[in-house]
Amino acid sequence: MTDDATSDDIAEQKAVRLQKRARLIEDAETAGEGAYPVSLPITSSIAAVRAQFPDLEADATTGLVVGLAGRVVHSRNTGKLCFAALQAGDGSRIQAMVSLDQVGESSLERWKELVDLGDFVFVSGEVISSRRGELSILVAEWKIASKALMPLPNLHADLSDETRVRQRYLDLITREQARATVRARATTVASLRATFASHDFLEVETPMLQTIHGGASARPFVTHSNAFDTELFLRIAPELFLKRAVVGGLERVFEINRNFRNEGADSTHSPEFAMLEAYQSYGDYHSIADLTQELVQNAAQAVSGSHVVTWADGTEFDLGGEWARLPMYASLSEAAGVEVTPQSTVPELEKLAASVGVEVKLSTHGKLVEELWEHFVKPGLTAPTFVMDFPVDTSPLVRDHRSIAGVVEKWDLYVRGFELATGYSELVDPVIQRERFVEQAKQGARGDDEAMRLDEEFLRAMEHGMPPMGGMGMGIDRLLMAITGLGIRETILFPLVK
């Protein structure tokens, strides 16, 4: 099957395969067996056999008999000998040789009549090398483990982007890069956990369904609990519950889990995404930035063997060294050619925004500064950079800067020009936190869908005493983007599509 195969072609092939399935079932019932075996006498894997015999000479025998299974991805039948390439889930392949001498006429004809591309097949036989030097299994016994009713795509032709996303299983079957991305993601998450463990962090889990959405500025997904007869939200962030854990004495915690935001989807955004958040008692935004750099660099090392990663298009990107720390206001002033400070008024900022075509809904000082910074400065960022010291009115959970009035101790980490992570010196004063929540509620009343709600339960926890801490959040999908150079839909195994 090619990516553009017609529905009539597919229907015809499926009809033929259904007939073969019917025969399999009939033959199995006659023999008193199941057509789809529950288990198989597998003794090895394709990868293990290839590793054991990497340089077997042509036309050689080994005397080793193995039983293994794989998906048929190539097949060629001749009079007395049939060849099939079996592929394992890791992409490794081995040739199966089904010969008249070894299996007999009836079994050989049955192979020719029943086995199709895409079928899972078990074979047992001696490991040999063919006359052309191809590592092979000289089959003595075989069995169809599972019948494919749909034909495989052409392994030598690219799937369309749409097919790759909607039918990721076909992408995994046909493309090594897809399989490598899944492995890279697993390696990355394992590396993150190992780095946290080396710093005595404890992994915890917090609620996905919440009665009040908070911890980030974003629109939530809303649902309803029949059992409790109440409105619930899919979480936009785990922050407020993780901080409760810190109040309870869990001084270093992290969570890797799903977040949901009812917003746009593009090359760097997905409504459902994997998020890492961590909180470190007695730290600040400097110490948590150091930890974030270590997390990213360790993950790059685990995946690529180096801090210099190679992207899917062959580009090399250096995640090593010490990353720059760039003040937001100073960098904006330099790029815009106009001094912008925490004391700049909204009309002044609106005038600057209008002069360059930047539109901001519900203008506030912080929203204008951040949008202007994205217009003037963000396009020039490529190397990993911590953008430091944000406006106070867009960061309600962050403590005031220790020496600069009107800003908070917050950074955003940019890699390849997109935001990878964010970090704070966390606000721990419950009185100021209540004032910030009240201001957020006012913004919500003015139509800001992303404003946080006042969370009395969280404030009650804070009132029991919250230690000073640094906190950070990082998208796992975006971390894979930084390491692999792929878009976000490629880093998510099964992304949401229309």
Give, region by region, the residue ranges found by the protein language model.
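Class II aminoacyl-tRNA synthetase catalytic cores and aaRS-like
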Residues: 1-498
